[in-house]
Amino acid sequence: MFTNTRTILIYNSKVMNTHTHTHTHTHTHIYIYTGDQVSVRGRLLSLKFFKVLKLFFPSPTSLATSHPPLSSMSPYMTIPQQYLYISKIRSKLSQCALTRHHHRELDLRKMVGHANMLDRILDEIDEIDSEVVLCDAADGSSTAEAHSASPASSDSSPLTNNIRPISIM
């Protein structure tokens, strides 16, 4: 399915209620990366922005009794374990999509909420990306004059050097 995929990151973010300063609900996001880029919904992003993410593999709340608690699970999984975990998630989502029950609208609302949260995160990453490029340009202005003699360094930016397309289908 994913060519040259090395690791799958699952990032669990908690949404904060600004009035009571308590965690109201949790969103789970799946990032797939090859080498040093991350593909999120077809967009390639640099991995340096994901170093601050705390990675762990949450179980669904409805199945919390059948899985060990998150604190006992290892934050690092082997690639076969990751693919097995992702295939189980996909099969459960497929089963939920095919079942006809009164909670289906609620599940669709959750999925739309996750997509909206991911869009907000991507917007924040774009802002961080533009700030890093500006900082790199400001820091490298004195060194750029020394490297301007080489044609390869003047043609490419640091973020586009290693971008290579990956197949999502």
Swiss-Prot record:
Highest taxon of source: Eukaryota
Which PANTHER family is this protein grouped with? Answer: PROTEIN ECM13 (PTHR36826:SF1)
Q: Compositionally biased, Polar residues: which spans? A: 158-169
Question: What organism does the record attribute this protein to?
Answer: Saccharomyces cerevisiae (strain ATCC 204508 / S288c) (Baker's yeast)
Q: Where is this region: Disordered?
A: 144-169
Q: Which InterPro entries match?
A: Ecm13-like
- Biased amino acid composition, Low complexity: 144-157
Q: What is this protein called?
A: Uncharacterized protein YJR115W
